[in-house]
Amino acid sequence: MSTHVPRRVALVTLGCSRNEVDSEELAGRLAAQGWELVADAADADAVLVNTCGFVDAAKKDSIDALLAADDLRAGDGEPAGAGPRAVVAVGCLAERYGNELAASLPEADAVLGFDAYPSIGEHLDAVLGGATVPAHTPRDRRTLLPITPVERGASANVAVHVPGHARGVAGGSAAGSPGRRRLTAGPVAALKISSGCDRRCAFCAIPSFRGSHVSRPADDVLAEAEWLAGEGARELVLVSENSTSYGKDLGDLRALEKLLPQLAAVPGIVRVRTVYLQPAELRPSLLEVLLTTPGLAPYLDLSFQHASPAVLRRMRRFGGSEHFLDLLDRGRGLLPGLGARSNVIVGFPGETEADVDILAEFLEAAELDAVGVFGYSDEEGTEAVSLPGKIAEEEIERRRVQITDLVEQLTATRAQERIGSRVQVLVEEITDGIAAGCAGHQQPDADGSCLVRLPGPAGAAAGPPAGGPSGTGQPGLPGQPGQPGVEVGDLIEARVVATEGVDLVAEFTAVLDRARPSAGRGEAAPSATGARATVLVGRPRADGT
């Protein structure tokens, strides 16, 4: 009889939803290589911290997470289970800084780049065995694949590893796993359709460590969508660095227009949401598909970054207030009431008070549902570092507060305008008769939420009442004979009756589509993501692309 004790690993994820997908790839690989995933870093033999390297605050959070993991480390002579014996950094911060990070942070036993992911278990074994694993040496990943987009596919995941694009990796929790293992059991799942970016925005360092744009083949994306549906996912959030570029390296500039209806038709999936859209590339045919295809979220996530044409030109971007408002008008002509979000940067070198006024006037006219406001800061390796016209940090902060205050007023007003309307809410949690989730115009974990008051005692229970069938897929009213109560994963309709900032408060009206039981669904693999009591100290939404 074997007495082998599986090695235990805790995964800690910081940063954006793309990093969450990468962590689930790492989880799948580790499970396939014999590792046991544990939720509490204190119970692990090794802690793997998937870092974020986007902005200074995210970098600090990543370093703090590594230091917190080191604080849990077992002392010399302590027995197994007394704490982790290895702390390893992966992710964007590790990829971007590599051996520099290793030299400045001896608390990390290893600093590994993306190309180490396929053999991640072997690297952890080596660290636990006392070996010194060479730190990653950073390279500009834009130089590692062919310049011509259509020539990249053959090299991706052969010459270099593209995180989140794994194919045929065993170890998922169901047969047919595409190489990832879910770390959360909720009804919303991120699905990576591409990685990298070919744009050269003056402020952005992401392409240098995420690389050139590489699309996943449509068959891979569809197979993973079907697997996620089998794992209990009901909404797919399509993530990338630039979703509008999807397919250009596959030889089909309209590949996304073809893929989206196929994803919306996957059995069990009730909503597909595309994020990280580049306004300059949002062609009319894609806009029409996004806003008229049944099953796609009524939603546009548009990376405006500013509204002054002069500032945008210095950013190496295109457009301005007039172009952006026209884009929103065309979208609302196709789908009145759509949700729209964006990010903006204030304090970019050369920005004037007049430019700030242009941005404010644009935001007042745009009627956006959510806006992320960032103050500019230099990112090493970017063109903007050397631009003239730098603005003092105090003035950048003043402008950030000014625009943030305006945005909070505008988005709260926008939410109030939805009072009396009916929204479709995907239930993510039920507590004391209140169902919490997101309406179609709200991106999960980004744009606020919707709290739905359920009718009577039937709604207070997460499970069906005695004698009521579950997972029928049929609409109905909770509490009626033969009808179950509302459950997590149900798509329900509700009438908005009040607001709290950007959050909506609504009254239940009907179940539109019930969560279906799945033979492939099981317990999600444990993860230290979100476990503030152990390691994770913060997760900013790092998506300024």
Swiss-Prot record:
Compositionally biased spans, kind Low complexity: 455-464
Keyword line: 4Fe-4S, Cytoplasm, Iron, Iron-sulfur, Metal-binding, S-adenosyl-L-methionine, Transferase
Annotated catalysed reactions: L-aspartate(89)-[ribosomal protein uS12]-hydrogen + (sulfur carrier)-SH + AH2 + 2 S-adenosyl-L-methionine = 3-methylsulfanyl-L-aspartate(89)-[ribosomal protein uS12]-hydrogen + (sulfur carrier)-H + 5'-deoxyadenosine + L-methionine + A + S-adenosyl-L-homocysteine + 2 H(+)
Domain of life: Bacteria
Positions of the UniProt region annotated as Disordered: 454-486, 516-545
Residues engaged in binding [4Fe-4S] cluster 2: C197, C201, C204
Cofactor note: Binds 2 [4Fe-4S] clusters. One cluster is coordinated with 3 cysteines and an exchangeable S-adenosyl-L-methionine.
The protein's role, per its UniProt record: Catalyzes the methylthiolation of an aspartic acid residue of ribosomal protein uS12.
Protein name stated in the entry: Ribosomal protein uS12 methylthiotransferase RimO
High-level lineage: Bacteria, Bacillati, Actinomycetota, Actinomycetes, Frankiales
Gene name of the record: rimO
